[in-house]
Amino acid sequence: MIPFLKRRWFLVSLATVLALGIGFAPRLEALAKLPGLRHLIVAFVLFVMALPLKASLMLATIRRPGAALLATGINFGLLPLTMWATVLCLQQGNLLRGPLGENLAIGLLVAAATPCTLASASVWTRKAGGNDAISIMVTVITNVSCFIISPCWLLLTANRNVNLELAPMVIKLGLLVVLPMTIAQLLRIHQPFARWATSKKPQLSILSQCGILAMVFLGAIMTGNDLRQTSIGLAGLGSFSWMIITVLSIHTAMFFVAFKTSTWSGLSRPDAIAVGFSGSQKTLIVGLTMAVEAGGSILPMISYHVGQLLVDTLIADRLKRKAEEPGEAETQGID
């Protein structure tokens, strides 16, 4: 039991805070409404996540940017388009019904518009024997540009369903996402600090995950209050089931599209693995922020994140077993 908790403590904690937030939402409503608390948590988490990132690892990728650009195009292009088409089909088929279905639809579109995750794409890439420099490059490109691209996608796909103003959202994401990451990288110019941040990567990762849990908790409180004002019934359960199927299917499909396209394009296996993971993964913290700001449900973003952790663990293990040199993949390990 203890080894399981050590390996899966984040997933267990995620389920716990989600249940507590939704279950005790009326009593905790004041906490979720504290001015600036959510924004402070988001900025802190992204600052901590960016501290261990080594910009130097991207230099080799810059000289051969094809793989990183392909992954970025899938993550910020094909995936949102596919999600948009899927949500429209579900709505036309009356499979996302009522107020809950509408909120889930917005949440799905938000999840698709968020950037690549800051940590797990590189972790799973290394675990599978891939080139994690590409994953880091995709992470930086998508997160630095998300303050413009993500609101534009949301404005295009969900404009009729959300009260979204482009300029305020761009400014807010720029301050909450890009600025903390930029400050963290500027601090790394001081080499002693950079070495300290690199050596403390596991501890910083745990700290950032705790911040994500705090953000999930606040989002769960808001979701719980919304659910209490909505009649769920069988239609709501059906909408929720279709949401789960959608996030799992699209994430898995995008991985294999990215991986196969890379292979057909002549990229090496390590590069193709990196494109697969970074082209299909989405970051939780930015998605939660956008979902709350857009008035959508946080459940699709959380479901996408949990789904990618579970699915990509299976994929990484399979790729690792099929690698031509499994011993080399073993030595790379996971942070």
What are these regions (language model features)?
Residues 1-335:
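Alpha-helical transmembrane segments of multi-pass small-molecule/ion transporters
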